[in-house]
From Swiss-Prot:
It comes from the Bacteria. PANTHER family: NAD-DEPENDENT PROTEIN DEACYLASE, NAD-DEPENDENT PROTEIN DEACYLASE SIRTUIN-5, MITOCHONDRIAL-RELATED. Nicotinamide binds at V94, D95. This is NAD-dependent protein deacetylase 2. Binds 1 zinc ion per subunit. Disulfide bonds: none annotated. Residues 1-241 form the Deacetylase sirtuin-type domain. GO terms for cellular component: cytoplasm. NAD(+) binds at A13, T17, R25, Q92, V94, D95, H112, T186, S187, N211, I229. It is found in: Cytoplasm. InterPro entries: DHS-like_NAD/FAD-binding_dom, NAD-dep_sirtuin_deacylases, Sirtuin, Sirtuin_cat_small_dom_sf, Sirtuin_class_U, Ssirtuin_cat_dom. It comes from Streptomyces coelicolor (strain ATCC BAA-471 / A3(2) / M145).
Length: 241
């Protein structure tokens, strides 16, 4: 490959498993082991039940994502940007590890939001997750918004919520414009994010799928890689510029 193509990287949970963050939908994922756990991140249940909120905050407090460090896959994406290759990251992950690895925040679209912030469902006030977790540690079960008293939630897209249409629109535009679309660590089963791969192919991009399990888009892909992401993604990206 010659030149420096625009590379769009759709990253899913599999990218962060080497950082100790579980793949919730995988064979041993939390949603399969404990279907009741989905209630903790389902908007209707969360808003309607203080006990669900209490348990949800405890889950956030104990989450591996808050203490995780970037792994080789995250660093490989950051290195691609440092080498001057035009790259945009469209991530389904909420852990913020792409940015911690050194990818410019303006190059990352967090399709499902971020677990590093909280937002008030009443007034929209936003702040660091760490501040709310400090209140949990101090003894609050269900800390309300300090501005309006409203219900606080993580700044992620819960089940039952819509993705931000502005973010999704920008992701679609990037998918249409890119020359290479890499889907890595994602089952490509969650819409509308998964459909970005089809958008890219329909607009002439080369599609590369890097995932342990088969995906619905493998037949559309120019290349399918089943090797471990921590070694496969760095090797792939080294060849792109």
């Amino acid at each position: 490959m010659t030149g420096k193509p625009l590379v769009a990287i759709l990253s899913g949970a599999g990218v962060s498993t080497d950082s100790g963050i579980p793949d919730y939908r995988g064979p041993n994922g939390l949603w399969r082991r404990d279907p009741e756990a989905e209630k903790l991140v389902t908007y209707e249940y969360y808003m309607g039940d203080p006990e669900i909120r209490r348990r949800s905050w405890l889950m956030r407090r104990d989450s591996a994502a808050l203490h995780a460090e970037p792994n080789a896959a995250h660093r490989a994406v950051a290195d691609l940007e440092r080498r001057g290759v035009p790259v945009r990251v469209l991530t389904q992950n909420v852990d913020g590890l792409h940015q911690l690895a050194g990818v410019s925040a303006r190059k990352v679209l967090e399709l499902h939001g971020t677990a590093r912030d909280c937002v008030c469902t009443g007034c929209g006030a936003r702040g660091p997750m760490a501040d709310v977790l400090a209140r949990i540690e101090a003894g609050e079960d269900d800390p309300p918004c300090l501005d309006c008293g409203g219900v606080l939630k993580t700044a992620t897209v819960m089940f039952g919520e819509r993705l931000d249409p502005v973010v999704l629109g920008e992701a679609a535009a990037i998918s249409k414009a890119c020359q290479v679309f890499v889907a890595v660590g994602t089952s490509l089963q969650v819409e509308p994010a998964a459909g970005l791969a089809r958008v890219a192919v329909e607009h002439g991009a080369r599609l590369v799928v890097v995932n342990a399990e088969p995906t619905p888009y493998d037949e559309l892909a120019d290349e399918v890689i089943r090797e471990p992401i921590g070694s496969a993604l760095p090797a792939l990206l080294r060849g792109l510029g």
